[in-house]
């Protein structure tokens, strides 16, 4: 089941991008050298070869495997190639990042409004007859921010990727709008109530404050003090808002602690612990038993093919909440190798190129994006298309740096 791939707005934009490249550039430039400069040539080769092979195994009998092949080839591989054709300089990379960040501010504003009015305005944009993910989860009495992503955790993943980029723009272009965009994305991420993402962002914030240059550190601490003052004032003026934020923080502490305490009117999944994510690791054992090399196939959890070991008994479950488990159970060892090959190389490469004492080095934000994504994947089963845009921009940014250095 699953049918043909949906004609989504992102796919229409990709089609437009392809047409622009064909008519403007007249030819496709090879990106082998830029990939080698960043050390991503072989990791990306392994990633795409392994995933295409794993899904190709099921393609003759499983339409969702064809959909996944389409996503991997067109929305990941082809997307990187197309962006590297269009974005030809560091100035172009900066403009792309600024545009992405500015757009995220608009999305964050509407998402926060959705929380305030208790309804998702983005649902009015749904024009397809097929069922699409629109969760509209209510937790602790308020709707969770989710924007157009269908689920709060997916929007939280988007915020986790956007915030490091917004931080870069805020550092290098000091104006009120950039400060607002950064703040809006932080608030939106908090209002998703995705506890794993909130903890990751808090950890990254603390690390960044420690390793950043003195000037940046002072600016951040000043901003934090200002936000704290506003929060105190709001808590006195509107006690219900203060209680809501307090409950979110409390739910995060309970989720990552050993407390058996619960939150009244929590809603959705359990407010106590993240044991379900740990239990899902047993799905890898189930995969190894049944098809170690190719896995159980795309969307195995919705087809009743996936089981987790719960209280010593294998039980069929229809959810995957851990991104790494998703790679393994759906695509076997091939998918697992593809995943870890790519993520390890992204972290290693970007860490080598980052210089946190120089705030103008965009590799700092790229590194934080990759760390954020890798960490959030522990609690979110999502392959964000924004990640591939960031990877393409990272490749172009450093390829141009190498070209400038060699002149």
PLM regions and their residue ranges:
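Long extracytoplasmic/lumenal interhelical loops at the membrane interface
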Residues: 139, 260-331
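N-terminal hydrophobic segments of proteins, predominantly signal-anchor/transmembrane helices
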Residues: 1, 9-78, 370-373
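Hydrophobic core segments of transmembrane alpha-helices in multi-pass, intramembrane catalytic enzymes
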Residues: 8-18, 67-80, 153-169, 196-208, ...
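Interfacial loop-to-transmembrane-helix boundary motif in multi-pass membrane proteins
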Residues: 36-47, 74, 82-120
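Alpha-helical transmembrane segments of multi-pass inner-membrane proteins
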Residues: 52, 95-127, 137-141, 147-212, ...
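A membrane-periplasm/extracellular boundary helix in multi-pass inner-membrane enzymes
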Residues: 109, 115-118, 192, 212-267, ...
């Amino acid at each position: 089941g699953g049918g043909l791939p949906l004609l989504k707005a992102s796919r229409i934009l990709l089609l437009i991008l392809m047409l622009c490249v064909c008519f403007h550039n007249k030819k496709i430039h090879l990106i082998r050298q830029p990939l080698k400069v960043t050390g991503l040539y072989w990791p990306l080769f392994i990633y795409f070869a392994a995933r295409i092979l794993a899904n190709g195994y099921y393609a003759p009998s499983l339409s969702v495997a064809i959909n996944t092949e389409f996503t991997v080839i067109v929305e990941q591989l082809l997307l990187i190639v197309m962006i590297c054709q269009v974005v030809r300089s560091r100035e172009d990379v900066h403009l792309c990042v600024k545009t992405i960040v500015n757009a995220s501010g608009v999305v964050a504003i509407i998402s926060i409004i959705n929380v305030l009015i208790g309804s998702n305005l983005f649902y009015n944009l749904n024009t397809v007859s097929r069922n699409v993910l629109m969760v509209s989860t209510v937790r602790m009495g308020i709707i969770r921010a989710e924007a157009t992503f269908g689920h709060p955790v997916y929007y939280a993943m988007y915020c986790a990727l956007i915030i490091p980029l917004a931080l870069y723009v805020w550092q290098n272009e000091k104006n009120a709008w950039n400060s607002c965009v950064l703040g809006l994305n932080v608030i939106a991420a908090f209002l998703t109530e995705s506890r794993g993402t909130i903890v990751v962002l808090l950890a990254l914030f603390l690390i960044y404050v420690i390793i950043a240059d003195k000037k940046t550190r002072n600016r951040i601490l000043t901003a934090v003090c200002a936000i704290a003052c506003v929060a105190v004032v709001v808590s006195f003026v509107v006690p219900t808002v203060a209680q809501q934020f307090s409950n979110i923080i409390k739910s995060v502490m309970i989720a990552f602690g050993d407390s058996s305490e619960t939150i009244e009117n929590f809603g959705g999944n359990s407010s106590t612990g993240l044991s379900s994510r740990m239990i899902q690791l047993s799905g890898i054992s189930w995969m190894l038993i049944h098809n170690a090399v190719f896995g159980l196939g795309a969307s195995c959890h919705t087809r009743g093919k996936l089981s987790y070991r719960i209280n010593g008994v294998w039980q069929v479950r229809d959810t995957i909440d851990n991104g790494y488990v998703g790679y393994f159970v759906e695509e076997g060892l091939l998918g697992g190798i593809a995943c870890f090959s790519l993520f390890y190389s992204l972290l290693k490469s970007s860490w080598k190129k980052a210089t946190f004492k120089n705030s103008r080095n965009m590799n700092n934000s790229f590194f934080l994006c990759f760390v954020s994504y890798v960490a959030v994947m522990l609690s979110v089963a999502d392959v964000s298309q924004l990640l591939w845009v960031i990877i393409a921009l990272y490749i172009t940014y450093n390829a141009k740096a190498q070209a400038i250095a060699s002149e």
